[in-house]
Amino acid sequence: INDGWQNVYNSGSATSTTINGGQQNVSSGGSATSTTINSDGWQNVFSGGSATSTTINSGGWQAVYSGGSATSTTINSGGQLSVFSGSAVDITQNSGGAIETDTSSDLSGTNAKGSFSIAGGSANNMLLENGGSLMVLDGHQASDTTVGSYGTLGVVSGSVLRGTTTLLDKSRLAGDVVTNEGNLYFLNNSAATFIGTLTGTGSLTQAGGNTRFSGQLSQDGGIILQSGAAMTMDALQAKANVTTWSGTTLTLDNGSILTGSVTGDNTGAGDMTVKGASVWHPDGDSTVGALTLDNGTVDFHPLTTTRLTPVFRAVSLTAGSLSGNGRFLMNTDIASHTGDILNVTGNASGNFVLDIKNTGREPVSAGTPLQVVHTGSGDAAFTLNGGKVDAGTWEYYLSKENTDWYLKADASQPGTDNPGANNPEPPVRHTTTSADAVLDMATAPVYVFNSELQSLRFRHGDVMQNTRSPGGVWGRYTGSDNRISGGAGAGYSLSQSGMETGGDTVFELSDSRLAVGAFVSYTDNSISHNRGGSSTVGSTGGGLYATWFDNDGYYVDGVIKVNRFSNELRTRMSDGTAVKGDYHQNGFGGSLEAGRTFSLNENTWIQPYIRSTAFRAEAKDISLDNGMKAKAGATKSLQGEAGVNLGMNLEIAGTVVRPYLTTAVSHEFSDNNRVRINDRYDFTNDISGTTGKYGAGVSAQLTANAGVWAEASYQKGSNIESPVTGSVGFRINF
């Protein structure tokens, strides 16, 4: 047949046909025997048709469709057999011959590798070259496939590759999702690329050549680079352990992330480059030849565990040399004197940042240095992100000794116990932010309680004129902003807002009155630590009071009060890790105040007074989620105060208004509140000191039984400054 066609129909047959640029169609019931297909020749075997002993030469093509069959086809170099869900058996595939099919077909025959077959959705020992291809369909599998030059292995999601899948130079692996349960073997492939998801329990081996992978890659059996192979991970999310031979290269580029160890073998170790936004997570001990960071990151941090879990273990990275610029994110557990280490056996050059995470647990031997970097030689510079690392109670700093870098507990002369000629001062140690937050929170109940337990005037307003039989109810809102520096911590700001309400019964005595009552309170207290973090204290309280005042202006007021503090400690370690610890605490206290009101003239009065306040919060064990533990001893406060109020009685539009000024001085005597951190270090929260108080207020008698008041004050002392404290309230008599 020369450029014509031949149709073989039912019961028809064709024998020894030669097709030169023409076409032979074998339909149902027809048969063709000993057909020779030359260049541009074409044989179609349709459903029900059959072809036997066909020879396909260069440029020829035999197509077997669903329901059609071919037996004893010989494919010579340049020829192609295409089987589309049909059957082709006893095939002889000579070198350079191409087979195009999928795993829904039935095939058997021999090739340069030996016997091959496709049956029941399983392809075995297929050879795809010179335009040949195999599509592995969903639920099917292909084992021991070899993809030669210009061959294609297509994989549909849900199918599996088994055995050894070999991809030679100029071959192609195609598929959005490829599951490999065997060994995917790239052999001297000069420019292989794969874009998609490669997953499975198998392994990937590259011998020589260059490959580039994009998308996602997960191979439980790992990756092996050998014989000068060069692999580039380009925008790839990869999870696999990598073994590199000497002379190979692995490059992470364009934001790639590799999770897994990289190690050498008995030939040595290959080189590795991490570029740009790419990150390498070595989750096991690793060894590379030359390590180059081009603004890349090596992150030792485990992705599925934290440094506080029992499975935490240190990881070492050994490199023959180091160059470039980049970051190393590392874990340490200084408490057990272990941590990740970067070991450069040869020359190191460039600038690198160490971002080190540690725990809040206390080192057994404080101040003992922990090595994090070793270099054999070179001028590499390492700096510590944030300048410090938290280790229990104390901060650690990065110190260079020769070509090694250590974490040490003080900045001036790390590790020096005694001053010497070159170190005239003792070592300086600095507490961590976690320790500071614990020390801050230990004093907070004192300031919360004392702010709630304000003077008699805050509770009753103008009590002598506004408290009468048989009694009444009252309430007030209070708010304050306090800056506290007392104690062993770095200090904090305390913002308080809350309500207090109560009621009393007033007894008329011969020359005096006695008010006996009860009250409840709640305040919300926000704490901003000076070194970072925002904690809260919710304070719920209640108490009893009794106030006596006679007709000559004398008064005595006593209060007892209990509180329940709900503490939520929140801060951040020096590496930015959030830290928290929640606990409850009980406290109780009271105050006793006495004074007298003198009339200076018909409308002006003065009221000197003295006051004492005492408070005690229970001891408490505190645990933070970074491993720090603390025991706050019983926190005590004892204050004495003397002051004077000066006011006037005015009548405005029929309403009695009493503006007043107040000034006082108080002294805190408590100087020995103890806190023990990590069962090792004792701190004293000394909150003693003198404070001056200044304020102004006004009360107004709206009706015979109802009054309101407001007061604002300022106080400043050695340990506290309150730029503004305000209170507004009311009282209604029965």
Language model features by range: what are they?
Residues 422-602, 606, 712-713, 718-723:
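Outer membrane beta-barrel translocator domains of Type V secretion systems
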Residues 92-94, 106-113, 144-148, 162-165, ...:
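Extracellular beta-solenoid/beta-roll
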Residues 368, 487, 528-532, 568-572, ...:
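Outer-membrane beta-barrel and related beta-rich outer-membrane complex signature
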Residues 363-378, 489-507, 630-637:
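Short secondary-structure subsegments characteristic of cysteine-rich extracellular domains
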Residues 616, 625, 629-734:
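Outer membrane beta-barrel transmembrane domains
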Residues 1-77:
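Thr-biased low-complexity repeat/linker tracts and other Thr-enriched repetitive architectures
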Residues 214, 345, 464, 495, ...:
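Transmembrane beta-barrel domains of outer membrane proteins
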